[in-house]
């Protein structure tokens, strides 16, 4: 265990005090600094990314009782009540400044990127997420399991690197779970968002043909990501793509037009989802699901090796 006496006992943090609006966020300069437990490292945060999940966690959107507008009284990524006060922030880049018992001394001083899905703390089938079940990066310091703090050697700034963990790991998990292969036609919704834009780039690296659905005003932004075809969100999907033409759908949107996604999937097609920014309640005709032999993947828990 390394010496923490040179570190402050209090720190600055943005603290969530309950579910609701921005009024539930409190800027504190006297929040207790965490100390690393056995097997953990203490990180001085260089940068922390902001994601939709921070909003969703704040309003309790992940709860099973979530209404269409996301209003609930409690709820975390696991659907259990969130403990308050809570420091949010799933995306963290920083440097190791203290070690818990049993951690390799060589870790001290390392620049690290933290895996938002803390796989080493997996509880049965449920994952522990930074900034939800455990305090995250909206603070000067954060303590995480050493196994989930990955050493990096990059010319990118801390701010640039902090944009990677949640978006890119989620996108890679979607592609991994759905088994995207070279030559397949992959349709990606919300393609200019964090997860969507990452999915476009990662699917292209796998050799897939990528069709990206975007809002009209963001078509030019998405063009630089390398999608083979850009489809305006305003255009009816069946008209733009045609029935039974897509091998895999990567979806982070959901919403009222969701049934059209199953229409464009080929028989034995695969659908993977990890978001519902247009609304979580959708209409499903079970006949469409079983007569086309479709496979649906809900993707939150990350496969081993996805982050690496």
Protein language model regions, located:
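N-terminal Rossmann NAD(P)H-binding glycine-rich loop of SDR-like oxidoreductase domains
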Residues: 192, 196, 200
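NAD(P)H dinucleotide-binding glycine-rich loop of Rossmann-like/cofactor-binding domains
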Residues: 78-87, 112-190
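Glycine-rich phosphate-binding loop and adjacent beta-alpha segment
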Residues: 126-127, 214, 256-308
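Glycine-rich beta-strand-centered segment in the early N-terminal region that forms part
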Residues: 32-48, 63-118
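Hydrophobic/small residue at the entry helix of a nucleotide-binding pocket
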Residues: 170, 194-195, 256
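Adenosine-nucleotide cofactor-binding segment
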Residues: 188, 204-258
């Amino acid at each position: 265990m390394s010496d923490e006496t040179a570190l402050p006992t209090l720190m600055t943090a943005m603290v969530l005090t309950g579910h609701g609006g921005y009024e539930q966020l409190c800027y504190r300069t006297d929040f207790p600094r965490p100390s690393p437990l056995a097997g953990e490292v203490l990180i001085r945060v260089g940068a922390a990314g902001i994601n939709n999940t921070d909003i969703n966690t704040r309003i309790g959107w992940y709860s099973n009782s979530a209404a269409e507008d996301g209003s609930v009284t409690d709820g975390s990524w696991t659907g259990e009540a969130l403990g308050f006060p809570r420091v949010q922030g799933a995306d963290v880049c920083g440097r190791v400044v203290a070690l818990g018992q049993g951690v390799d001394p060589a870790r001290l001083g390392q620049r690290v990127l933290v895996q938002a899905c803390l796989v080493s703390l997996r509880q049965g089938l449920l994952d522990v997420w930074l900034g939800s079940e455990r305090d995250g990066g909206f603070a000067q310091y954060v303590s995480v399991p050493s196994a989930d703090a990955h050493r990096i050697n990059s010319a990118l700034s801390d701010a640039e690197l902090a944009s990677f963990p949640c978006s890119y790991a989620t996108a890679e998990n979607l592609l991994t779970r759905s088994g995207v292969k070279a030559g397949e036609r992959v349709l990606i919704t919300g393609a200019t968002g964090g997860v969507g834009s990452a999915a476009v780039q990662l699917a292209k690296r796998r050799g897939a043909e990528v069709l990206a659905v975007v809002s009209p005003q963001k078509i030019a932004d998405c063009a630089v990501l390398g999608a083979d075809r850009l489809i305006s969100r305003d255009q009816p999907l069946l008209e733009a793509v045609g029935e039974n033409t897509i091998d895999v759908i990567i979806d982070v949107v959901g919403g009222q037009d969701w049934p059209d996604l199953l229409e464009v999937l080929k028989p034995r097609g695969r659908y993977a989802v990890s978001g519902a920014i247009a609304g979580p309640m959708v209409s499903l005709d079970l006949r469409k699901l079983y007569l086309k032999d479709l496979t649906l993947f809900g993707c939150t828990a990350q496969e081993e090796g996805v982050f690496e």
